[in-house]
């Protein structure tokens, strides 16, 4: 007995079937809108989901970390802490630099945050030191976000001071004005200045002090208003030679007289043109350079910003001398474009594979053309909606469209297959189209809305992960909706015009062979299904076993957050002993650079040494390693990192920490490794006690690698212990002592040279070439109240101590960050659990709090909400199906297919060695929407057969399974082949796409095999349950 379809007059499709011209023009309009939308959409790596982040930098040369914390950072933090919408505030106070990073809530516009920051800086101005060279400067930039472009400026004919001056005035300022640029930093620190190096013995012999010399210099170089003369007929502006512009002029400056003879500055000091900060340096490969790092504003489009920079570069470089060379060392957009191109290719491959599988099943060119038109039309039409939603073409939206290829073809296949059946039975194409489309309309609506219901929970995911996948979910939902519209309008209209009995019956050798093969498969399936229906409890036990197995696999599978991408750029931190000087660190850096540049995968290298707000201490260096394109190297980034670390381990006295740059940056601090864990306390003493103990234990854990801490408390300090009573008797104040020390050793900026284009500093210091180390303190002289010169050693003792090289705060409290990587044979979930277990064994005091930061914190949050996300998807689908079927039972039958998908996905991930990360979880959620289609197609026809033909439930579900076997197999294979290019991807960004493809392919294979047998059995069991329940109610009513 065969299932006969219910009669229909076309339903919602009738109007479009009967009006082919209108339908065609409507589809052309969708196509044109999509093409225009595609051309208008921006391109990026991922959806723009950055936290509004602002960095505030204050430089105070010569100040110790303790002074920077108490005098600069703390007053600013108190003002910033009062701002509304502030999510997190972190700060780093090091020698001469304070860097405060402010991260705001996602809902707060960046421009509003900027206004609040400016107001807070203004309020704190009176609380900051009066001799700050410059007020705090803020930038709309996340310091942990890698630069979108790095340029090296070198010259073989000009000193670096002149090169930096030209780059700063002619290049950097222009690039800063480009829309989307948040910050342009010049690493290398070779800003021009006049350096005055005092000869301590010479000024002592003449009875002078550094303070008297400083006063003379500042008084001789001024640039202030002088007024004007306003006569009866003329006005005259007053000017004077109050400015000194060159080192030669300063050299001739008279600073005092002795016995009537002038003492010039050149007599007691070396005066020369030099750099403002001599403890800064940058290199491009092995050549000293000015390295220009361009960072984007949070939320700015990387591609358009980089394109604007490249368009401007030729014009900017033309303004530089020919001896100055500007080289683009890295451009993140190169890999972003390559990744997007690869994803677009995989999308086209998915479309081709899906069309191929359609032809394989339909074995008819006209029947293949119809879904071949429907698929690209649905996908292209999605671009038009994406424009209005402010989306971009990125890896996630393209992945959504690639997966949608398998979804959108399902609707067309179901419609074509149903209409073809009636044509093969002898009905006219138009009548068959009306009947078939009307019969299948409800099924299409059920499939569409139940699938969209699965995506709804993704829209409510919180924080940055939710924002990230909102574009993915909405893009996929839009494609599915357009597909449903196309399948109920264009597809039946084309079937009525293109299909005929002759075209469907026309067969070649391939068609006949494949038809026989499918007949044999269906016959074998029918025999197997009959046996399964005779043993329902055994089949039910298999279904329950898959549920139990999916739970076990979920518990034991390694869990991660986001796949580690190979973007071709490695960020590195070089660490040396805490007492290392600038010269020592620069030498070590050059040794490491030599080793790194020998690696065959490395294309170029930039490195930076010194403290300027980017680097926290003199004993560390920053590196950026640019790898060759992926097709020009043999190994991916993780293997390159392992090889480089092994090579650098042979360089004595340094530790190298490397991490690949990622498109998704959640952290706000530049870290040595990928993951962070913080300890926060009310005092530095508590941290100094517990951090070493925790570090010792964490370094022994096999689940962690490259464990390091930013806690550095062994920096050498020369503590000047002043005898206040003796100083007071001589009329010497502590301010006098501080000023003398600052003049000698602080690279003190004592005066400003103003020009038409820029301002330059006069730097005062002692010449310590002949008196290195602590011996230089013996040369310090002070002026007593009677005008005499007093050696510092006569009123103070020098003690050598240890102190922190930098002081870090998180939300105004002291904090230290422990950074770590995860070895290949462990997952982030293993590492997080190991750290939590280790923390418990230490029994930390209550005044120390711990917390994961950045991507590790996001991982914890995502992991905690994952189960609820899947439950929400299942509940949403149950509600939608219950409404559509007006039944509490049938949705459960449909949802019984879900455990098989979970088992298949988790097994595939484990076999492939992939973690269960956010991308894989999205794949599992999508599987929930896909695999239930099989059950919907079976149950729809079974219910119709029971209702209209009076079949028994067993016969109805048996015939429905045989009748719908071919479209079920076809739609499943279409979805599988749509995901296959993602699973097999090997190009740039493949790490991001592969988990989604692996999970979906594995889930589809297992669910296809099992649900064809378990769904009919569960349908019959629930039918018996419904009958039993009805009989019980009937009996109670009779008794009542």
Curated annotation (Swiss-Prot):
Q: Which InterPro entries match?
A: AcrB_DN_DC_subdom, Acrflvin-R, Multidrug-R_MdtB
Q: Name one GO cellular component term.
A: plasma membrane
Transmembrane spans: 16-36, 347-367, 369-389, 396-416, 440-460, 472-492, 537-557, 863-883, 888-908, 911-931, 968-988, 998-1018
What is this protein's expression induced by? The mdtABC operon is transcriptionally activated by BaeR.
Q: What is this protein called?
A: Multidrug resistance protein MdtB
- Organismal lineage: Bacteria, Pseudomonadati, Pseudomonadota, Gammaproteobacteria, Enterobacterales
Task: Alphabetically list the UniProt keywords.
Answer: Cell inner membrane, Cell membrane, Membrane, Transmembrane, Transmembrane helix, Transport
Question: What is the protein's quaternary organization?
Answer: Part of a tripartite efflux system composed of MdtA, MdtB and MdtC. MdtB forms a heteromultimer with MdtC.
One Pfam family name from the record?
A: ACR_tran
